[in-house]
Amino acid sequence: MNIIKELEWRGLVKQITNEERLLKAQNDGAAVYCGFDPTADSLHVGHLMMIVTLKRFDKAGFQAIGLIGGGTGMIGDPSFKADERKLQTDEQVKFHATAIQNQLLRIIPDVTFANNVDWLGNMSLIDFLRDVGKDFNISYLLNKDSIATRISTGLSVTEFSYTMLQAYDFYNLYINHNCKVQIGGSDQWGNITSGTDYISTRVGSANTEAAGFTIPLLTKSDGQKFGKTESGAVWLDSNKTSVYDFYQFWINQDDNDCVKMLKYLTFLTKEEIDELEAKHKEAPHLRTMQKTLASEITKFVHGDKELNKAIKLTDAFFTGNILNLDDDLLELAIKSIPTIQLEKTTSAIDAIVNVNAASSKREAREFINAKAISFNDVAVQDENMLLSEIKTIKNNKIIVKKGKKKYYLLEIK
């Protein structure tokens, strides 16, 4: 498989420094790397493009390396950021780095991992200036779009040095791990070319085999940034975003975005995606593309077992059969429903309003009279009934159901 052709039909080629070197690296079975800075204790769906692309290179015969930025994470990448990042403590970076590496090991276990703190952490300022800084011209750095966009608003020396540190990462992996290719999002082009240029300077332009590759940033058809919801980021950690919510995020994607996402984020073939698109055009109400997208990505990130839970829970929410779920699925359901805490002396009508199942007491009464509200599958008939009078589940919890498909969760203090 020609890796460039594979990525081209998927629409994943943004920029390549040198196609010939990239294909030579593939034929030689050289290493490729992608960096992940530990800015949080979990990656989110915005990182999936790079995780999946790294896995594509692995499947194409490269030795894939995931580089955890335990060193560069102490500084923060300024590329196209409006403001300087808040510096993290050493303890925060170590904690985040460990969490992210463990997460990636679960998702892409065949990939090798490294941490740049292993070589940057022991480098003195004198060593950095002598071995790295002397090979970078200030005017060269100022011409980088990723740096130029920050000059007018202010850029510290700390962040200014980031691209040189990343260049040294590539050089270190090139020399010690036969890593000939760095991949990243299109916002990383400046940092990646700093690396290929630095390697060329160190080993000689006639000898270098380094190449850089970027993929486009994923945006939705309406122009909005991909990966955000009203409640915030969609995380790859099931403790931060439940598997059900993760699955639903993909189920709810717009028709106009699905083909692109299937190409970008799954390993389905062109023929399989074309067939899905044709089926969708015949019967769009079945949402075949969305269901396949959700299944493929949830399986990739969380595995078959968790995917099956998400599908069963989706069916249970649709049929209104929540309380008959087994304990594991009921726990997942509870994690996936918006929750508020209320005192046991709260009345039913106040609880309905507080949980946002109704906008007012008048509307709540209308729902009660229409038998449209239930607490743990028992229709509410008395608006003055106290929460203390209701049989709870799972440590003082009450599942509030409005109509057939709207759920809320009350936890009695």
From Swiss-Prot:
It is found in: Cytoplasm. Belongs to the class-I aminoacyl-tRNA synthetase family. TyrS type 1 subfamily. ATP binds at residue 228. PROSITE patterns: AA_TRNA_LIGASE_I (PS00178), S4 (PS50889). Catalyzes the attachment of tyrosine to tRNA(Tyr) in a two-step reaction: tyrosine is first activated by ATP to form Tyr-AMP and then transferred to the acceptor end of tRNA(Tyr). One of its GO terms (biological process) is tyrosyl-tRNA aminoacylation. Residues 346-413 form the S4 RNA-binding domain. One of its GO terms (cellular component) is cytosol. The keyword Oxidoreductase does not apply. It comes from Mesoplasma florum (strain ATCC 33453 / NBRC 100688 / NCTC 11704 / L1). It catalyses: tRNA(Tyr) + L-tyrosine + ATP = L-tyrosyl-tRNA(Tyr) + AMP + diphosphate + H(+). L-tyrosine binds at residues 33, 162, 166. Its EC number is 6.1.1.1. One of its GO terms (molecular function) is tyrosine-tRNA ligase activity. Pfam families: SYY_C-terminal, tRNA-synt_1b. A motif ('HIGH' region) lies at residues 38-47. This is Tyrosine--tRNA ligase. Keywords: Aminoacyl-tRNA synthetase, ATP-binding, Cytoplasm, Ligase, Nucleotide-binding, Protein biosynthesis, RNA-binding. A motif ('KMSKS' region) lies at residues 225-229. Homodimer.
